[in-house]
Amino acid sequence: MANVYDLANELERAVRALPEYQAVLTAKSAIESDADAQVLWQDFLATQSKVQEMMQSGQMPSQEEQDEMSKLGEKIESNDLLKVYFDQQQRLSVYMSDIEKIVFAPMQDLM
């Protein structure tokens, strides 16, 4: 029987070889080479982190913060590079979700 760690490493290499994974890498590289997209990306990451911290501490964003997030979302949607990135991320997430279901199926048997 194959070593489970060897199989996990093989899966990791297979995921990295997926065209969808490569498309996300290409889209990420395009963002990194465009100053405007990079600023929007950094704003998105900072806002996402702030909202996650608020939610974890039981707080909800104020109306002003929600409006700011909405405006940022509109800017992101209007940036072609970021739009492509998020579209490619979504395609990759379908694979990752399917893989997660398969990998964690034995754990469900124990519940």
Swiss-Prot record:
Signal peptide: none annotated. Residues 52-63 have a biased composition (Polar residues). Residues 52-71 are annotated as: Disordered. Pfam families: Com_YlbF. InterPro entries: Com_YlbF (IPR010368), YheA/YmcA-like_dom_sf (IPR023378). NCBIfam families: PRK13676.1-1. Belongs to the UPF0342 family. This is UPF0342 protein SAG1376. It comes from Streptococcus agalactiae serotype V (strain ATCC BAA-611 / 2603 V/R).
